[in-house]
A protein has these predicted regions:
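Cytochrome P450 catalytic-core helices
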Residues: 149, 153
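Sec-dependent N-terminal signal peptides of Gram-positive bacterial secreted proteins and lipoproteins
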Residues: 2-24
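Chymotrypsin/trypsin-fold serine protease catalytic domain
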Residues: 203-279, 309, 315-318
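Catalytic nucleophile loop of clan PA
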Residues: 278-299
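Protease-domain processing segments flanking chymotrypsin-fold serine proteases, especially trypsin-like
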Residues: 24-142
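Active-site-proximal beta-strand/loop segments in catalytic clefts of secreted hydrolases
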Residues: 132-133, 154-157, 173-176, 211-214, ...
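Conserved catalytic-core segment of clan PA serine endopeptidases
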Residues: 102-125, 129-140, 159, 165-218
Length: 329
């Protein structure tokens, strides 16, 4: 994460405490921007500030890195399940500008998902299980490593715009398979979400970048590798794959493994892509991967259109999303 000047909204001692209401951000006359960046401490990094930094620096080319593959011992993780109830992380309703209804998940017709047998190969090695702790519950999402210590996921996985509260803790486990893992488990120490996600729950803003601490001296991306992000405009009729950790399949099997499938982007608008790939709660935050395994969007949930058709979908990697993610890295 590059250095920027912060507009501090509240002072806290520890990272990853619940966020509070950001009333000032709702007034665009005060100079706020939908892609202003808010971190886990409630500090705001203004859009114009990080864009100046991006404009004056040479952005590194997004490259695929498969990681060292170093085998690390499993670590003792907090047992959230023992003390707190499970929280189904359902996306909020969209903004008034998006006339679609949204559900947490959709299995469309016959379930076409398959289990991933080998998560030691890319891109499955970079797809990660994220276990989340809230003040009164726990849950999980999916994310994808995009740098040595950064993960891309959904905004609703870390901040609930209805309550304005954030997670109190989280761990990221790359390549979790049959409830075992080889590449370490990494504590989330910070996160970055768009201010408009906190203020409105806008579907097109439902993404987040997580920052990870090293585990026994190793960074997650150095060990498991990371996926490149690809800026896009139109991806209709392109093939994408969406893999993650769906709760229905995990509960049926009794073990945590990756599931997913490939298909075609059937509809899109300027900021969202829609496809009839089957997903379920727990796959929130999964990457939309193109045929080159580049990230072109972030899966969010199920959408039902006014014509009655059901799709899954989420934010595309349009320029402001791409810029936000690059700045957060």
């Amino acid at each position: 994460m590059k250095k920027y000047y912060f507009s501090t909204l509240l002072l806290v001692v520890f990272l990853l405490i619940p966020l509070t209401v950001f009333a000032d951000e709702k007034d665009t006359k005060n100079g706020s921007h939908p892609y202003d960046m808010v971190n886990s401490k409630g500090e705001v990094i203004k859009y114009e500030d990080y864009m100046k930094e991006l404009d004056t620096s040479s952005l590194k080319k997004d490259e695929n890195y498969n990681g060292s593959g170093k085998i690390l011992p499993e670590r003792k993780l907090p047992n959230y399940k023992k003390y707190k109830p499970y929280k189904s992380l359902s996306p909020s309703v969209p903004s008034g500008a998006i006339q679609k209804s949204i559900t947490p998940y959709v299995v469309i017709g016959e379930d076409g998902r398959r289990v991933v047998d080998d998560t030691s190969v890319s891109p499955f090695k970079q797809i990660s299980y994220i276990e989340l702790e809230w003040a009164d519950s726990w849950g999980w999402c999916t994310g994808t490593l995009i740098g040595k210590d950064t993960v891309l996921t959904n905004g609703h996985c870390v901040v609930d715009p209805d309550t304005q509260q954030g997670i109190t803790g989280a761990y990221v486990i790359p390549g979790l398979n049959n409830s075992h893992y080889s590449y370490g488990a990494y504590q989330v120490v910070d996160y970055f979400v768009p201010s408009q996600w906190i203020n409105t729950g806008d579907s097109s803003q439902d993404f987040a970048v997580l920052k990870l601490a090293p585990y026994i001296g190793e960074n997650a991306g150095d060990v498991a590798g990371y996926r490149p992000i690809r800026q896009v405009t139109n991806i209709a009729n392109q093939t994408v794959k969406v893999y993650g950790y769906p709760s229905d399949r995990i509960n049926d099997a009794g073990t945590y493994s990756q599931w997913g499938m490939s298909g075609t982007v059937g509809r899109e608008d300027t900021s969202l892509a829609f496809y009839q790939l089957d997903t379920f709660n727990g796959q929130s935050g999964s990457a939309m991967l193109n045929s080159s395994n580049e990230i072109v969007g972030v899966h969010r949930g199920g959408y039902t259109f006014s014509d009655g058709q059901s799709f899954n979908g989420g934010p595309k990697m349009i320029k402001p999303v791409y810029d936000f993610i690059k700045a957060a890295q």
